[in-house]
Amino acid sequence: MISSNDFRPGVSIELEGSIWKVVEFLHVKPGKGSAFVRTTLKNVQTGKVLERTFRAGETVPQATIEKRTMQHTYKEGEQFVFMDMETYEEARLNPEQLGDGAKYIKENMEVNVLYWGEQVLNIELPTSVILEVTDTDPGVKGDTATGGSKPAIVETGAQIMVPLFISIGERIKVDTRDGSYLGRE
């Protein structure tokens, strides 16, 4: 059990049979009446966002989420298959479960798979990945003076905005949180 006074961003709680992650919280002490905690919660399974108010000191069950490091071994149809390198257990996830993270996963990449009991919830990607540019417009001499950007398709199929001097075959570093170009590798 966790007290509403101990809520912080990233804390996971069980509410109405689901796992919710605290995104924001605000401890409010009105001049009249008792204090309360106003929270913004995100459902880990569905992504639904909920505003919820708790009395100060109210206790709720804390979710026990286990992180297992797994390797993306292959893609079967639309499903991504991950394997635990210690137990050789497999976990299969749909692109809907992965959200935007599916655009950055390549074979043999290690990720943290989040489990609630035996149920796979989601994955945690590294903050940046190295991807090879497979398609982009060719750079022309003198393009760098304007400091513009152009779209590029990387090996996973994701479209990334890159500087004009990037060409096909180059390896670039991409931020998995927002899909931005971080630099050459």
Swiss-Prot record:
InterPro entries: Elong-fact-P_C (IPR015365), NA-bd_OB-fold (IPR012340), Rib_uL2_dom2 (IPR014722), Transl_elong_fac_P/YeiP (IPR020599), Transl_elong_KOW-like (IPR013185), Transl_elong_P/YeiP_cen (IPR001059), Transl_elong_P/YeiP_CS (IPR013852), Transl_elongation_fac_P (IPR011768). Its main location: cytoplasm. GO terms for molecular function: translation elongation factor activity. GO terms for cellular component: cytoplasm. Keywords: Cytoplasm, Elongation factor, Protein biosynthesis. GO terms for biological process: peptide biosynthetic process. Pathway: Protein biosynthesis; polypeptide chain elongation. Pfam families: EFP (PF01132), EFP_N (PF08207), Elong-fact-P_C (PF09285). The keyword Protein biosynthesis applies. It is found in: Cytoplasm. Involved in peptide bond synthesis. Stimulates efficient translation and peptide-bond synthesis on native or reconstituted 70S ribosomes in vitro. Probably functions indirectly by altering the affinity of the ribosome for aminoacyl-tRNA, thus increasing their reactivity as acceptors for peptidyl transferase. Belongs to the elongation factor P family. This is Elongation factor P. The lineage of its organism: Bacteria, Bacillati, Cyanobacteriota, Cyanophyceae, Oscillatoriophycideae.
